[in-house]
Amino acid sequence: MVVLGVDPGSLHTGYGVIRYDNAGFHLLGCGVIRLHRRKSYFERIGEIYRELDSVIGGYAPVRLALETVFLNKNVQSALKLGQVRGAVIALAMNHRLELSEYAPREVKAAVTGRGAASKEQVAFMVTRMLKITGNPATHDVTDALAIALCDLLKTGMGSAAVPQSVVSSGSAGKKNWAQFVQSNPGMVVR
């Protein structure tokens, strides 16, 4: 199962492609589509569409997952983000991909066990789950990878690859999360 995760933005759109099989999660590719402010907004949407179209052509995902709109006080920003998401959704439909969307807290909870996790905690868990050495380029990339991982976990495709302590819920999950943090003090961002 190959999933493309997309973290849409009008200036930076992150993407990550993950395959899950019996051996676990495999990072196939990731990156950031960086757009110039000098280009018109319509040109930027077109560039996002073309770049992601190329990613889909190269990796042949069967699913596309993206984050739901984060409500912002700036109405113009929210509208622009909605238009970018619309282009990504149209692209997914043109390629006949299965499409899912997840709230930011849902993505964080799926990957870290905590819906209020910081971007640094999400990035750390993504690098651990995908066995990435070094530092991924940006939070746009790790957020997109987290969205793809969330999709695999939520659809049941990748749940066998994650330690139970990360995905458990209720008081047992809190205890396991506390144990995890205690065992890994270098991961805690204060």
Curated annotation (Swiss-Prot):
Binding site residues for Mg(2+) 2: 67
Residue numbers annotated as active site: 7, 67, 140
Binding locations of Mg(2+) 1: 7, 140
Biological process, per Gene Ontology: DNA recombination; DNA repair
EC number from the UniProt entry: 3.1.21.10
Keyword terms: Cytoplasm, DNA damage, DNA recombination, DNA repair, DNA-binding, Endonuclease, Hydrolase, Magnesium, Metal-binding, Nuclease
Pfam families recorded: RuvC
Similarity comment: Belongs to the RuvC family.
Substrates-to-products reaction catalysed: Endonucleolytic cleavage at a junction such as a reciprocal single-stranded crossover between two homologous DNA duplexes (Holliday junction)
Tagged with keyword Electron transport: no
Cofactor binding, per record: Binds 2 Mg(2+) ion per subunit.
PANTHER family assigned to the protein according to its UniProt record, in alphabetical order: CROSSOVER JUNCTION ENDODEOXYRIBONUCLEASE RUVC
Organism: Chlorobium limicola (strain DSM 245 / NBRC 103803 / 6330)
Gene Ontology molecular-function annotations: crossover junction DNA endonuclease activity; DNA binding; magnesium ion binding
Oligomer status and interactors: Homodimer which binds Holliday junction (HJ) DNA. The HJ becomes 2-fold symmetrical on binding to RuvC with unstacked arms; it has a different conformation from HJ DNA in complex with RuvA. In the full resolvosome a probable DNA-RuvA(4)-RuvB(12)-RuvC(2) complex forms which resolves the HJ.
Keyword Disulfide bond tagged: no
Purpose of the protein: The RuvA-RuvB-RuvC complex processes Holliday junction (HJ) DNA during genetic recombination and DNA repair. Endonuclease that resolves HJ intermediates. Cleaves cruciform DNA by making single-stranded nicks across the HJ at symmetrical positions within the homologous arms, yielding a 5'-phosphate and a 3'-hydroxyl group; requires a central core of homology in the junction. The consensus cleavage sequence is 5'-(A/T)TT(C/G)-3'. Cleavage occurs on the 3'-side of the TT dinucleotide at the point of strand exchange.
Name of protein: Crossover junction endodeoxyribonuclease RuvC
Primary location: cytoplasm
